[in-house]
């Protein structure tokens, strides 16, 4: 085991400047070297006898000794050596002290090198006397400092202190900081930002945009600024220089002169000129700007008028070159026979979605209609559909087996039957057959109804897929596809059947995915397949279907997506318990404020029969509608309500979407819906076709998940108010309600 050896101590520093001899003068020759000292390297020792000359010469160590010593050193180094904490600190401080001294020595050497060769020559001259010829001596220092040294014999002045090192901390602090950095690591959050450098950097590149008035020299030499020309006007004045009064005076003088020259033909020409002048005044100028869009002719409508028109009906469109909406049925572009049917059915004014969607559909463009419930979407796709298939050859024995020309997909049986009733009003007078394919009926019976062929088939996705898989129906010549309530179909799990139906369509008449799909002339010449999708919301699955099967569609948005129509007044009441809600329902029905038909919604279908019995005990007739009813029972219940044979319909969310019952004055949510979308479609059963309605909702603490959305919907409505108990409820303050509280506890 060998002890740790310390390195030899550093050489002593050079003697101070005050004890050094002055340099030799340059005018005195150097003394000759001693005779006994040779100038070259001494190779032969002197003949003089030295002490210990007769002793035995020390022999060098052998190889075995060297190897043995090396093995001993390696063995000792391999053995662990215990060092106490004090020894380790002492070794580290000693090592650090040497590093600091070495760094200080290097800095002093670099500082001394800045003075040139004067210091070097001075130290060399003071340390030893030259012993060789002049050529072997160090060079004499030159420059101004050397001349001062020769004159007064002093050293060169010390170098000027560096500005950067002028405020250097003392060595003890620097040493402590370096030791701290070595053992604890560098500081991670230490900022290297320099405010002085940043300020300097920004002020150098800052451009001054201000200018003074005395810098403007245009007044000195440009006469335009000193002699401004005044425009001369006639009469009251106008930008063109003439007013209407002056123009009328000139026209009147011209007409009088014309009549005097030729009383017969001049008077006729004067009448034509006056008529032209009158029309010019009516059609142009300020008078047209002041007119409302309803008072203008179609050719006089400007871009500003169309913008105001869209704002009035809350219409938003996007998707390329989209035609302007129609203001009335006469400007729709529909054939005369279809317009006569519209008038016969009783559609006086088109709804907002009909104004925007029909002109686009007549150009054979694919369409996505995002409209609130109860906005009249059925007629917006039925009328363009009839115009399209009227251009196709009629069905006969040769093409009857190739399937229908158009299919309409609906999520529920009730909605499909309702669409079939509305479609038959327009299709039957034009000679087109319609067929409905829904569940609840015998599939063989429905196939027998289609034995003569049908141009239009309205179906639910599940039953239509069954017919296609059983080879009872083919879609070989289907050229028109409509998906009504597409988001509802996706929610009910019909995404896969919808994809199967759309994949079964022929690809020969599919539109190209290019700019030609937006050209109405090209689409009409080719008679390509046209696809229309109507929805109230746009979930991801609906967007996925639209991207796959629609080509450059035009998107029409009516109102705000997910909001109720403005014709429905929403009232909400905080009532806990079934019995209290039944008493409040009896008060509402007995108030006489609302006339039948009335719809009451509940969340659980077993409550339908119980609530219906209670309503009968109150003195009102009622029927029920829920998922456990057969198709015949559903149709009978809706027929009784439409024919006003019963007063109240008690239903679940099955009837909350797509069921069109006219003149529903009141909707009561006996149980608050589980989602705000279901609530929107429930209250959409009233206030349809531009009529007003009322929706009353009972809510409790169990509905905390939807209270925030309910409060937001009431806030956006202009005819509804938010009650204080709902406004201050804890669950209505943030989205999520009770779910966020549960997540916070877990």
Curated annotation (Swiss-Prot):
Reaction catalyzed: ATP + H2O = ADP + phosphate + H(+)
Binding, ATP: 371-378
An example Gene Ontology molecular-function term: RNA helicase activity
Tagged with keyword Hydrolase: yes
SUPFAM superfamilies hit by this protein: P-loop containing nucleoside triphosphate hydrolases (SSF52540)
Subcellular location: Cytoplasm; Nucleus
Segments of this protein annotated with the region Disordered: 1-203, 721-746
Bias type Basic and acidic residues, positions: 65-74, 84-109, 722-746
One Pfam family from the record: DDX23
Intervals of motif Q motif: 327-355
EC main group: hydrolase
Gene3D superfamilies, sorted: P-loop containing nucleotide triphosphate hydrolases
E.C. no: 3.6.4.13
Biased composition (Pro residues): 1-34
Keywords assigned by UniProt, alphabetized: ATP-binding, Cytoplasm, Helicase, Hydrolase, mRNA processing, mRNA splicing, Nucleotide-binding, Nucleus
Motif (DEAD box): 484-487
Main location: cytoplasm
Record GO biological process: mRNA splicing, via spliceosome
InterPro entries: DEAD/DEAH_box_helicase_dom, Helicase_ATP-bd, Helicase_C-like, P-loop_NTPase, RNA-helicase_DEAD-box_CS, RNA_helicase_DEAD_Q_motif
Subunit and partners: Component of the U5 snRNP complex.
Family: Belongs to the DEAD box helicase family. DDX23/PRP28 subfamily.
Entry comment, domain topic: The Q motif is unique to and characteristic of the DEAD box family of RNA helicases and controls ATP binding and hydrolysis.
Protein purpose: ATP-dependent RNA helicase involved in mRNA splicing. May destabilize the U1/5'-splice site duplex to permit an effective competition for the 5'-splice site by the U6 snRNA, resulting in the switch between U1 and U6 at the 5'-splice site. May also act to unwind the U4/U6 base-pairing interaction in the U4/U6/U5 snRNP, facilitating the first covalent step of splicing.
Name listed for the protein in its UniProt record: Pre-mRNA-splicing ATP-dependent RNA helicase PRP28
């Amino acid at each position: 085991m060998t002890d740790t050896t310390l390195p030899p101590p550093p050489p002593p520093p050079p003697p101070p400047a005050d004890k050094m001899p002055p340099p030799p003068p340059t005018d005195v020759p150097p003394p000759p070297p001693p005779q006994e000292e040779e100038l070259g390297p001494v190779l032969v020792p002197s003949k003089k006898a030295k002490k210990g000359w007769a002793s035995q010469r020390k022999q060098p160590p052998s190889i075995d000794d060297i190897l043995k010593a090396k093995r001993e050193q390696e063995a000792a180094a391999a053995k662990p050596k215990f060092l106490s904490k004090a020894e380790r600190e002492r070794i580290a401080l000693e090592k650090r002290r040497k590093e600091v001294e070495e760094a200080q020595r290097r800095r002093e050497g670099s500082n001394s090198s800045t003075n040139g060769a004067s210091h070097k020559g001075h130290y060399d001259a003071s340390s030893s006397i030259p012993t060789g010829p002049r050529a072997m001596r160090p060079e004499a220092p030159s420059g101004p400092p050397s001349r001062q040294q020769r004159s007064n014999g002093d050293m060169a002045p010390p170098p000027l202190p560096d500005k950067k090192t002028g405020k250097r901390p003392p060595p003890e602090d620097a040493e402590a900081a370096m030791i701290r950095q070595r053992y604890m690591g560098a500081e991670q959050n230490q900022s290297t930002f320099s405010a002085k450098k940043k300020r300097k950097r920004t002020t150098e590149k800052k451009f001054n945009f201000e200018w003074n008035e005395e810098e403007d020299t245009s007044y000195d030499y440009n006469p335009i600024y000193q002699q401004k020309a005044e425009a001369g006007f006639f009469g009251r004045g106008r930008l063109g220089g003439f007013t209407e009064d002056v123009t009328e005076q000139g026209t009147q003088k011209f007409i009088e002169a014309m009549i005097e020259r030729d009383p017969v033909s001049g008077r006729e020409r004067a009448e034509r000129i006056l008529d032209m002048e009158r029309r010019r005044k009516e059609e142009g100028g300020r008078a047209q700007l002041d007119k409302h869009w309803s008072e203008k002719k179609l050719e006089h409508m400007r871009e500003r008028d169309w913008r105001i028109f869209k704002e009035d009906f809350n219409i938003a469109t996007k998707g390329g070159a989209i035609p302007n909406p129609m203001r009335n049925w006469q400007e729709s572009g529909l054939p005369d026979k279809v317009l006569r049917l519209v008038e016969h059915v009783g559609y006086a004014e088109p709804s907002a979605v009909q104004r925007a969607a029909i002109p686009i559909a007549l150009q054979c463009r694919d369409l996505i209609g995002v409209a609130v419930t109860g906005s009249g979407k059925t007629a917006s796709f039925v009328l363009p559909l009839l115009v399209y298939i009227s251009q196709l050859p009629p069905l006969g024995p040769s093409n009857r087996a190739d399937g229908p020309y158009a299919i309409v997909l609906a999520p529920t049986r009730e909605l499909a039957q309702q669409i079939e009733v509305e479609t038959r009003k327009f299709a039957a007078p034009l000679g087109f057959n319609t067929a409905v394919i829904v569940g609840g009926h015998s599939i063989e019976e429905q196939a027998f109804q289609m034995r003569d062929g049908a141009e239009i088939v309205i179906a639910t996705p599940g039953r239509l897929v069954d017919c296609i898989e059983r080879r009872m129906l083919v879609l070989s010549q289907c050229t028109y596809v409509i998906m009504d309530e597409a988001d509802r179909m996706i929610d009910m799990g019909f995404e896969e059947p919808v994809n199967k139906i759309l994949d079964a369509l022929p690809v020969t008449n599919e539109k190209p995915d290019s700019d030609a799909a937006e050209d109405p002339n090209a689409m009409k010449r080719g008679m390509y397949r046209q696809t229309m999708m109507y929805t109230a919301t746009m979930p991801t699955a609906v967007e996925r279907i639209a991207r796959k099967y629609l080509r450059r569609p035009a998107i029409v948005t009516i109102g705000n997506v997910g909001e109720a129509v403005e014709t429905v007044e929403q009232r909400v009441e905080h009532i806990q318990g079934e019995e209290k809600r039944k008493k409040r329902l009896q008060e509402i029905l007995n108030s006489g404020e609302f006339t039948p038909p009335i719809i009451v919604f509940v969340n659980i279908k077993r409550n339908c029969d119980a609530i219906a019995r209670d309503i009968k005990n109150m003195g009102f007739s009622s029927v029920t509608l829920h998922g456990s009813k057969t198709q015949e029972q559903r149709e009978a219940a809706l027929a009784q309500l439409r024919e006003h044979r019963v007063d109240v319909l008690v239903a679940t969310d099955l009837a909350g979407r797509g069921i069109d019952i006219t003149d529903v004055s009141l909707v009561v949510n006996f149980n608050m819906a589980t989602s705000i979308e279901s609530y929107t479609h429930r209250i959409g059963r009233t206030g349809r076709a531009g009529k007003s309605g009322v929706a009353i909702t009972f809510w409790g603490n169990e509905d905390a998940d939807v209270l925030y959305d309910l409060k937001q919907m009431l806030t956006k409505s202009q005819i509804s108010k938010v009650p204080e108990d709902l406004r201050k409820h804890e669950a209505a303050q943030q989205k999520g309600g009770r779910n966020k509280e549960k997540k916070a506890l877990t």
